[in-house]
Amino acid sequence: MAREFSRTNRVGQQIQREIALILQREVKDPRIGMVTVSDVEVSKDLNYAKVYVTFLQLDIDAERIAEGLKGLTEAAGYIRSLLGSAMRLRVVPELRFYYDQTLVEGMRISNLVSNTVRDDKRRMAEAGREEDEAAPDDTTEDKA
């Protein structure tokens, strides 16, 4: 039976922290810019690590994402060597970088929900005004 927190999960969390520090302090590639390491998945044999990253530029497009991932991929050997000196592992995993879409998708869904709520409130207000306009006419007819 697998434990709730297996060794691969613990190693993945530690690798995530170390890579975040390395990217913040050591890697000076302008293509990368401000990057956040959102998750790391390590293979069971600890030979490979999928590193999920998010770029923090406001005007990010597919071209800049590809450029940032290319910069990270080219710096993967350097990051791996720094990771090896920071952690005690028999084999330091080969790093593979992927763009994490969850933040972008979360913001898109949040905007959709906000727009829907705003539209519903507007429709309710318009429907309320129509009822209010119809109601005074009905009361004047009753008095006459």
Curated annotation (Swiss-Prot):
Composition bias, Acidic residues: 129-144
Protein name in UniProt: Ribosome-binding factor A
Source organism: Aeromonas salmonicida (strain A449)
Quaternary structure and interacting proteins, as annotated: Monomer. Binds 30S ribosomal subunits, but not 50S ribosomal subunits or 70S ribosomes.
GO CC terms in record: cytosol
Gene: rbfA
Family: Belongs to the RbfA family.
Function of the molecule: One of several proteins that assist in the late maturation steps of the functional core of the 30S ribosomal subunit. Associates with free 30S ribosomal subunits (but not with 30S subunits that are part of 70S ribosomes or polysomes). Required for efficient processing of 16S rRNA. May interact with the 5'-terminal helix region of 16S rRNA.
GO biological process, one term: maturation of SSU-rRNA
